């Protein structure tokens, strides 16, 4: 009914949170629906050693049940997820080491992760949340699959909010495919989406 009525909320904490973790959060940002209908949200949690970790949680039954496997990279938070090929998820993470984004991919919903070639190299950041979305060829004028990314394009301070496009699956983010929206201070979190 287009959001006029809603079911009662379902508490999924016991399904996904290890009791030894200090907390578990989604995002911030948005989740995705994969081509096969799987719902996926980026997550962050602080483990029993008080170290933050980013990963994903997913549901194959329209949100009735949820699962988490392994984190993608330790000392990371505030991630965004995109399906870059059918069944392949890319997790783009705030890295508390600073300077640049950490990026990993998984083909098995986070049971195993592979560091992406662009990780800690291609996207600078000031230790801040960022946004990542996949835009299919049918939905853009270039007629090719692209990734869009937004963040404060600096290594210190939250300014120069920029949107970047990658035409090669996130390997490169060339200057000619970037638009700076505002160079002023005060820009931090952003969330890209398709409507």
What are these model-predicted stretches?
Residues 1-195:
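Asp-box/BNR beta-propeller blade signature and adjacent active/binding-site loops
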């Amino acid at each position: 009914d287009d959001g006029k009525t809603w079911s009662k909320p379902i508490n999924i904490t016991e399904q996904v949170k290890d009791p030894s973790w200090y907390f578990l959060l989604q995002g911030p940002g948005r989740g995705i629906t994969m081509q096969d209908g799987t719902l996926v949200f980026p997550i962050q949690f602080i483990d029993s050693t008080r170290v933050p970790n980013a990963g994903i949680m997913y549901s194959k039954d329209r949100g009735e049940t949820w699962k988490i496997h392994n984190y993608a990279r330790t000392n990371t938070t505030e991630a965004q997820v995109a399906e870059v090929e059918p069944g392949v998820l890319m997790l783009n993470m705030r890295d508390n080491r600073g300077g640049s984004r950490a990026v990993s991919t998984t083909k098995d919903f986070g049971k195993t992760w592979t560091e992406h070639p662009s990780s800690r190299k291609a996207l600078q950041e000031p230790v801040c949340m960022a946004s990542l979305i996949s835009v299919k060829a049918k939905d853009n004028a270039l007629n090719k699959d692209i990734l869009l990314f937004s963040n404060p394009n600096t290594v210190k301070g939250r300014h120069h909010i920029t949107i970047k496009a990658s035409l090669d699956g996130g390997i490169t983010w060339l200057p000619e495919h970037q638009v700076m929206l505002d160079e002023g201070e005060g820009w931090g979190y952003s969330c890209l989406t398709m409507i």
